[in-house]
Amino acid sequence: AGLTPYSVEALSCFIAGTKCEQIFLRKTEEEGFPETMCSYHRVFLGAALTGILPAPKCMIYTNLACDGNMMTFPYLKEKYSCPGFYIDVPYEKTQSSIKYVANQLKELKHFLEDITEKKITEEAVENAVTNSRKAAAHFKSQLALRKDHDPVTSLTNELYAIFMCHLLAGSETSLKYTELLLEDVKNAPKGEGLHVLWMHIMPFLQQPVKEAFNYSKTMHISACDFVADGFREMQADDPYEAMAEKMVHCIYNGSVSERIQMAEKLAKLTDADGGILFAHWGCKGTIGASGLIKKALEDAGLPTMILDGDGCNPANTSDGQVSTRLQAFAEMLEKNKEEKHS
């Protein structure tokens, strides 16, 4: 349709990288938004309220994953007098839910055609879904190799992966990314480092996290549930139902058991030594579920750490504390690994 998609999290992460996020956070406080709200959404709202954020042509949002969506987008829709499209994803993971969402996606196509005054062909929709299917297959293949291959990587690579499976899903770029990723993993040797399963988003900007994982040969992020879910395989033949299936079966929709099952599956697939669950400030769903996820995974034999922090606002987290906790967790995993092999 000729539109460039961007997200709250992506833009706020970029703004935080420029070190000027506090200006926008203060602006949202002045407007009465609670400090307990997700920092990504608060930075985004602040940027909009100060006028630095250009008015978009339209807004598309869902009730998936983040409850901040239901506050941010209706507010900005009114503020900008901007057309918006809301996709309601039912809690129940049934075929009727898939058909319900598929019908909304068909309406979304017409909505975008009206906004852009450009026709979106059914062939273009089919091609996008075909690309997504191929990308999911490549991603699944590289996950299966992670037990015996340890590519040296960085948090930036993980950030790219999130873009590819969400903002650029269905694109030729996303497909190319997974092809190259698969080749990189195939060519990477087996290392001696720890395999870590990361759950939820990553604090890409936090120095101790970068020091622990960037180009490290001692600790590797072998899988991330947020990314793996984004590259979910789709079974339905109809392209709209395939996309709807991906949304309905998202691990952030429905019971917390979905997230636990995904984590257990990824840990087994990649032979993870431990798991890190990032409890991002203001993410009520993850913070509320973190204790249940940790207990379930540890009962299944996967040592798990809940890492409290903020991926966007450094004022809400301590580098020293994060560094100490990561080091202690790594030492524990190393000890467990030595005992396992002795």
Model-identified regions with their sequence ranges:
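Metallocofactor- and cofactor-centric catalytic cores in central/energy metabolism, strongly enriched
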Residues: 5, 16-19, 26-30, 34-42, ...
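Gly/Ser/Thr-rich loops at beta-strand to alpha-helix junctions
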Residues: 11, 63-69, 199-206, 281-288
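Peripheral docking tails and interdomain loops at the edges
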Residues: 291-342
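Acidic/His-rich segments in extracytoplasmic proteins that coordinate ligands and/or metal ions
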Residues: 40-114
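A charged, amphipathic alpha-helical module
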Residues: 102, 106, 110-233, 252
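Glycine-rich, highly charged phosphate/nucleotide-binding loops
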Residues: 32-50, 251-265
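Redox- and metal-dependent alpha/beta enzyme cores, enriched for Fe-S-associated oxidoreductases
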Residues: 1-26, 197-268
